[in-house]
């Protein structure tokens, strides 16, 4: 990668310079890129200043004492409401009057770039350009009303006398009045005239026109605080807040332009998550619907607890609902309902009831403990001697033990020091299991302590608190509702918070504000917020330092401006630190602009970073099937690893990266609760691009240093500490390993190719015999033929030959076939299967269809005598309608189909279908090729059949079938015709190019080609035999020659049972992977290196390496990606921000984003993992 790849290409730079001023001003377009009449700019200025004009009228009347403040607000609001309706109806009139096609009202770059032809100041095209209008009539009315309210309340908010009362400064009042009205005009223009494209874009499409509401929403928030201050007296805090917000009000345009303030939809979801997690003790949820439902239920629980009069009742209510809301109730209900319908009896249903019984017992014990401790224990102020202090000491010990047991499970302790207890040099599953046994036992102990011991210990601590003894207040209800919920929802964090609160209380004086003014519930709430923000701050700081340092230390990342940016970051480091702190307080991503060390505060958004539900979209391709097979097994193994603590502390928003060969799995935790965790797994594309390969190579290096090296020192350091990826553990998963071998020395060997032809006939015989013996209805008729005294007559299959081809058919067939066999295509990696004349001869399939040949004598068909009264001698006449015209002197070479009779009454059980017994080759050619038929192999295969239940009769019957000459002749005819179709006219050894083509389903032209392709089932069997033979040739070259027929059958049975041999592009290839065939094989050709390759997939238990990613690095890069693509429209595939970065894993992070911004090839729906 060149370090000076442009951040934005010339076109996008020009586009950005036109769009950004429009965003700053709220919608006016003063930089168009083409010449426009002056009235275009004048009209926009008038529309922009219109709210200020009406607000100025009201303000002037108020200052002159003519109107009171609320009448002033009403007057300005009414005038603006009338103006808004006029503006909107003018837009509607222009649309109806215009004869041009109305443009689509979406974010369309091309539409923004179109040049408009303006005819007059008030022309339809001018009005449509200035006022695009609304998509929905409801929004036309609603937005107009909001515009009137915003103008009226804004006038009231910015009255000079009011501002002077707040600050007592005339100069400050003038500045706030001027810039405040600029802010108000920007918001009004965006709402009612033309909506600007916001830098804070959450949704890819604004379907319901929510974006215009963004700026007025913040206007209303600021005004609401001022109104509260007006009507609520004696609240100094509210007055200070109002003063601060009046100052911030003038900076709103800059916050809107920088994208710091979220749009309404993102703000709502973010606010619900924050309140649910820190105010109500819950967790962020896997879907927006679950978030809404859980938020309502949790808020209802907190409110209901306030109205319970009994203190014991309050404690029991909080304990019970805290436990129940921390469970995955929806999944449990769905599972029980599904099993009651689909699995009425089975171990899985019993397991679900055991699970429910376990939860009921835990709930009963928790309620019993809470009530007993609350009722009987003494409630004195906490001290070192009372019972709550004793429980606090126990919690400290428990926290230390759990931390040690968790860190032992990972390869690195706190991500820095090598864990001496973790297995070293783990490369195979067997070695891993041998060395991991002790750690798994420790993991079980940890899980018991975390799931059973810790919650009850914390419930004891909370139940003994004196705050619950007296009359409960709002703060007590909120704090303890959260505390009793956190005990179950996030046990490890709750334990840490409880220990901190207990420790601070024990070591500090009782007279300080912390102990005197706050109850235990509020202390826990504040400690929880501080804990979360401190972890975020450390992660953000580490991310910022990594971006800053690598921009200089990594040569491929160093640009001409890097030195300047580094110096500026050092000089303004306090300001950069303020940005990081502000981003941490808002819990919003730290946005590195273009992933350079230029940091901005991204707008707050949900923890998932994307508006849609996880797993709804993915860029599906041929490689997706590997993830479909792997994810269920990976999920099962993750359950054990998460329960043991191998992946560290499980928090919503955590990201993990799994690696195996060329596969990369991106794992994100969506939701956590008591004994469950919800995750999303994404599969990234296999290594193709150079950027992807470079970062994947660095991931391999990080994992190799962690898992595949012997360390001499006991506690060595993590050499890749600055990387966003920290190795955690390895997971044994049953999946496909991908091996690619060079076959050039085998497939082009003359001796191997010579043996190939003979082996092909044997494999054809075996496959056809196996197919016929296992056809539906064959085994059911085994006993029906034993009582028959006479062998059945075998009528020739008449009227099954293809009708004469038209010249167009012949030309089409020849051109397609010879194009496939041209020299340009012999090196294709996977020749495509040509479905030749599949629908060409549909007429022949119609019952009773006879084609009349001009000049011929019409013969009577056997099928015409439906009554069955056919003279016996007529049955022996072969009707050969449909054959090409030939010379009379050469008619002895034409095929003749006599009526035949099996010598064995059981032969029809392995007889070929009637349509396969038709002839298409001259008799002389068939006799010539019949000498190649291996009769001894044919008889051996028949004797090996297992189609009889009576073993004493089986050998005799199979011997009779093997000696049936008529049956053998049928097999000779069909096998040799297939053989002739696969190899063409030449009887020489095939070339490697020929092998590759036929393997791909492209057969050479021959007189038998049509005959074979018209029988799709037989065609597939012949192709299958050819592929089996190729695999047999490779195995013989690798493992040695085959000694006897039994060993050959062993090979073929293994292919049939354990292998799929075909093309990667086949649908059956994907089906075989999903069915978990043990092995898959495909033949290919590398045209760059000129070698033949074999690809073998082997299903086996192998180790997947898993590491934890810095969550703030992921969120920051995703925030930049969203800004670049949705606002700057920087979709250049070679842009700087998508290039490989070995420490930030920038390219992989972009891939893992939700489509359409990212492009994972697989994305699972939320997967619920049970942690017990």
Swiss-Prot record:
Any one Gene Ontology cellular component term annotated for this protein: membrane
Bilayer topology annotation: Multi-pass membrane protein
Main location class: membrane
Transmembrane segments: 45-65, 73-93, 140-160, 173-193, 208-228, 244-264, 307-327, 357-377, 388-405, 448-468, 494-514, 534-552, 565-585, 607-629, 634-654
KW Disulfide bond (keyword) present: no
Keyword Protease in annotation: no
Glycosylation sites: 1120, 1147
Domain of life: Eukaryota
UniProt keyword list: Glycoprotein, Membrane, Transmembrane, Transmembrane helix
Location(s) in or outside the cell: Membrane
Family: Belongs to the pecanex family.
Protein's name in the database: Pecanex-like protein 4
Organism, as annotated: Homo sapiens (Human)
